[in-house]
Amino acid sequence: MPPVDLVGLAAALVRLDSRSFVSNLAVAERIEAELGGFEVERLDYLDGAGVAKRALVAHRGGTHGAATGGLAFSGHMDTVPDTGWTTDPWDGRIAGGRLHGLGSTDMKGPLAACIVAARALPASVPVTLLITTDEETTKAGARLIAARSVLARRAAPAAILVAEPTVMTPVRGHRSSIAITAVATGVQAHSSTGKGRNANWDLLGFAADMKAIFEMLRDDAAWHDIDYDPPFLSLIHI
């Protein structure tokens, strides 16, 4: 089919139900139909409930083998549940200069904008689309792209523009978190013999290392940013 304009594409995507607990294949197929001239990689999987899902990676620009770099646009196909709607959540109508429907802001409108922007770039400019699903729940689509996408690795974009509507204004970063579980293994023995190996002693060294990192993040200005709270480390329990 011929490419659709931004508003038309956003409305078409809104009209397809892709709440996180249902399949997004119809949305993925509709998006792929808009990507003529792009190399498209499909990454299919079953979610934890056995529902068929698909993430997409698309790339265009440069010559084969020399098309790395450039910009990647990223967005997700799934939406939150339709709780609280008093009108048809998948109507996709335009009223009062606004697109109405579930996911019109988060994030089928922005996703449509990514697609239209990528298509508008000169064919010689490398551009990649990273289109995920299950963003509202398990992040499984993004995890799959990171772990298995051959095309994303080959494209090696220099920067990523994520179209998530954070406070409805461009931001240059997003705070995240990481959790680590450290395990030390000892050798069991009676505490009076000294013949065992007490794993707690090894963990004390780990805790000291974590304290040093905590102090560095708290005190070293190189890790601080006026737009964010300072990065923070917590040792929860031993």
Name each model feature, range by range:
Residues 12, 116-122, 205-212:
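Short glycine/serine- and small hydrophobic-enriched flexible loop segments
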Residues 149-236:
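Midchain, well-structured core segments that form catalytic/ion-binding scaffolds
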Residues 96-105, 188-193:
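A short glycine/serine-rich beta->alpha loop
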Residues 43-45, 75-77, 90, 133-134, ...:
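Fold-independent oxyanion-binding glycine-rich loops
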Residues 107-179:
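Acidic/histidine-rich catalytic neighborhood of metal-dependent amide-processing enzymes
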Residues 1-2, 77, 124, 174-177, ...:
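Secretory-pathway/membrane protein signature
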Residues 2-102, 123:
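Acidic/His- and Gly-rich active-site-bordering loop/insert found
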